[in-house]
UniProtKB/Swiss-Prot annotation:
Described purpose of this protein according to its UniProt entry: DNA-dependent RNA polymerase (RNAP) catalyzes the transcription of DNA into RNA using the four ribonucleoside triphosphates as substrates.
Stated family: Belongs to the archaeal Rpo5/eukaryotic RPB5 RNA polymerase subunit family.
One Pfam family this sequence matches: RNA_pol_Rpb5_C
EC number annotated for this UniProt entry: 2.7.7.6
Taxonomic path: Archaea, Methanobacteriati, Methanobacteriota, Thermococci, Thermococcales
Annotated source species: Pyrococcus horikoshii (strain ATCC 700860 / DSM 12428 / JCM 9974 / NBRC 100139 / OT-3)
Name of the protein this chain belongs to: DNA-directed RNA polymerase subunit Rpo5
Keyword Transcription: yes
Assembly information from the UniProt record: Part of the RNA polymerase complex.
GO terms of biological process kind: transcription by RNA polymerase II; transcription elongation by RNA polymerase I; tRNA transcription by RNA polymerase III
SUPFAM superfamilies in alphabetical order: RPB5-like RNA polymerase subunit (SSF55287)
Length: 82
């Protein structure tokens, strides 16, 4: 045991699902909306969810949220250096 407290951030009820898009998914997303990664909202590499996923700068994260009024919706963020 490392002596370090381990906490799985994704098991918390308030943290939505996160995943890293594959290169094919990333390309399809950017083409669909006719945008560049620089036009996406940013998320820092030091964000606990990004660290838990092992994402690196340039990766695009898909975040799946649930809403009682809107149902399920997705949004995307590009990982940037701190």
């Amino acid at each position: 045991m490392s002596g370090k407290n381990e906490f799985n951030i994704f098991k918390h009820v308030l943290v939505p699902e996160h995943r890293i898009l594959s290169e094919e998914e990333k390309k399809a997303l950017l083409e669909k909306y006719k945008i560049t990664p620089a036009q996406l909202p940013q998320i820092r590499a030091s964000d606990p969810a990004v660290k838990a996923l092992g994402a690196k700068p340039g990766d695009i994260i898909e975040i799946k949220r649930r809403s009682p009024t809107a149902g399920v919706y997705y949004y995307y963020r590009v990982v940037v250096e701190d």
